[in-house]
Design a protein with these regions (language model features):
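Short beta-strand scaffold segments in enzyme catalytic cores
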Residues: 2-9, 84
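Zn2+-dependent cytidine deaminase-like catalytic core
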Residues: 16-109
Length: 111
């Protein structure tokens, strides 16, 4: 399954990501690759992310972040952060992180 994304930072820089599949250990998703690249370069303010993917190079369908990535992203963005999902028929669907994860976990929930 192929996934790629582009993360737009408020600084104007764009960080790309792709999923990396492994046989023996947990794989990493494109969204987390892009965010960790950006964060490691000092970025902290994010505009939006564009995500596309599919089960072959010839077929790209709507591709939404998995639950792990939704939680991960929610810890670095505000609730209005936009996620744009691309499809193979040139359709772009816009979501906010809150649309996809309305009840994210925060460390403050433990107190």
């Amino acid at each position: 399954y192929y996934v790629g994304c582009a993360l737009m930072c408020k600084s104007g820089k764009i960080y790309s990501g792709c999923n990396i599949e492994n046989d023996g250990i947990q794989s990493i998703c494109a969204e987390r690759v892009a965010f960790t690249k950006a964060i490691s370069e000092g970025e902290r303010d994010f505009e939006y992310i564009v995500v596309c993917g599919g089960d072959s190079l010839d077929y790209l369908d709507d591709c939404l972040p998995c639950g792990y990535c939704r939680q991960f992203m929610s810890e670095f963005v505000d609730k209005d952060f936009k996620i744009y999902a691309l499809s193979n028929n040139d359709k772009v669907t816009e979501y906010s992180i809150f649309d996809l994860l309305p009840n994210n976990f925060r460390l403050t929930h433990l107190s």
